[in-house]
Regions:
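Nucleotide-sugar donor-binding catalytic core of glycosyltransferases
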Residues: 2-251
Length: 251
């Protein structure tokens, strides 16, 4: 049952990604069409979460989510903005329930990547404290976290190494996933298998890309292309790691 629920959440995440790309939350939610996800070998998986899944969205103080965005709207367009739009999508989703007693899953909207530097890079150093504070509040105000120790809760942690909350891999691995999150389900963009920052049951989703930028670059499928594969090569932190040893792994 839990694996089916995780699959449905994955479908919901895919639905959200489709909503983000097409730029219309209302149209998708009103139509309730069955979502289709292409699989290998042309297989198609079909699942409609409406009526099969109930998600309770915790009403947390604005300091954990909307206030950082109001302070710095750049959070709406960077690659980790998925945490914002998943929250917005769920608030008006048909799977949302206002009765926590009938919920299958509990979602805690904590924006851990909205503390940006002057150049627009998220600084996750305060994210563990922020997450622990939110979970402490949830455990004090509602009985559901303590009832399951977080097993039926999910969080969106879209940073470089997910809930390890560090942009340097060596330090992220040394830190590991925040202990208080180790029984919860994590929805994250980091998806490297057999890595300490990706635990079993995590759901991997693509990074966020502003819809208007994607749509501006769309080409008809039959358009001749001069580039088949683009390899970015050495991507590095010029200030802290000019050789690209930890960020690009020396590639």
């Amino acid at each position: 049952m839990k694996m089916r629920s995780i699959f449905v959440i994955a479908i919901l995440a895919a639905t959200t990604a489709a909503v983000l790309f097409h730029g219309s939350v209302v149209d998708v939610q009103q139509s309730h069409h069955t979502e289709r996800i292409s699989g290998t070998g042309g297989d198609v998986l079909e699942e409609d979460p409406v009526g099969k899944l109930k998600v309770y969205v915790y009403d947390l103080p604005a300091k954990y989510n909307t206030k950082p965005v109001e302070k710095d709207p750049r959070c709406l367009t960077h690659m980790f903005a998925t945490e914002i739009f998943v929250h917005r999508s769920l608030l008006s989703s048909a799977v949302r329930t206002l009765d926590p007693e009938e919920a299958d899953w509990f979602y805690a909207p904590v924006y851990t990547t909205c503390d940006l530097t002057a150049s627009g890079h998220p600084m996750p150093f305060d994210s563990p404290r922020m997450m622990r504070s939110a979970i402490r509040l949830i455990a004090e105000r509602w009985p559901y976290w303590n009832r399951s120790e977080g097993v039926d809760h999910f969080f969106v942690t879209p940073h470089d190494f997910g809930a390890c909350f560090h942009f340097q891999e060596e330090k992220a691995m040394a830190r590991g996933i925040l202990p208080v999150l180790r029984r919860a389900t994590l929805v994250q963009t980091f998806g490297q298998r057999n890595h300490v920052c990706l635990k079993d049951g995590s759901i991997t989703i693509p990074p966020y890309a502003p819809p208007w930028k994607m749509e501006a670059q769309l080409l008809p499928p039959a358009t001749p292309r001069s580039i088949f594969v683009y390899f970015r090569g050495l991507f590095y932190d010029a200030g802290n790691d000019p050789e690209g040893g930890y960020y690009a792994r020396g590639a």
